[in-house]
Amino acid sequence: ARGDLGADFPQLKVRGSVLRTSPVDAGPMAAVNGRNFTCRRRADGGYTVSQFGASMADVVPDSFRLMRHFLRSWMANRDFVRLRFGKRFFEELGIPRHFPMDRASPFERHRVLDPRPSARGIEQAWRRLVHAFPAFRDARIQQSWAGYIDVTPDAMPVMDAVPRLPGLYLASGFSGHGFGIGPAAGEAMAQLIQGQAPAIDLHPFRYGRYGS
């Protein structure tokens, strides 16, 4: 959304919850992407598990400001994203959108994003995992955590210079694909910033594709 620099960028965030199990000897060796859960074996013999299609989207002021960009995407993916209205709306309502440079910015006051995992999502993922693989019945949940995923209306990142702000380059909105395309994206952005021709075509990731 439009911030203190006056640059428009339609981006929201969803919260994903994950758990880690104790080691399981007879568990699957390959990564599993099931109908309602995913799991992947870890180097310590345990598994990282999440519930498929259970990302949580907090309804915040930007949800309304950016509705025209995101409505079609949400309608197409409403079975995979849960909406939640709670205190996060009022917390973000109090964040100033313009702030003087001689005061602490909202980014300085909120340095760490460490959201609480969804207890319901963790319990459902665990129950479905045990149902599919009985070998997990004697395992334990050793840790659970959550994180925010930045998303754009078309689930593709923006990797481009911001035309109205010379020297500002944007690489954001990877929509959950950051680990997969991050290395190539980093190389392409480094080339772009240095004035070189990127090794990949960045036109599909241009800043202005949302009408910005």
Q: Language-model features: where?
A:
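Flavin-dependent oxidoreductases
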Residues: A1-P96, E108-A119, Q124-A132, F136, ...
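C-terminal active-site/capping subdomain that shapes the small-molecule cofactor and substrate pocket
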Residues: P10, R140, M156
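Active-site proximal loops enriched in glycine and acidic residues that flank catalytic Cys/His/Asp
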Residues: K13, Q51, Q143-W145, S172-G173
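A short catalytic or substrate-binding loop motif that flags glycine-/basic-rich loops and adjacent residues
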Residues: A31, D150-V151
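Short, small-residue-rich loop/turn micro-motifs
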Residues: G53, R103, A161-P163
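C-terminal lid/capping helical subdomain adjacent to the catalytic/cofactor pocket in oxidative enzymes
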Residues: A135, W145, V151-S212
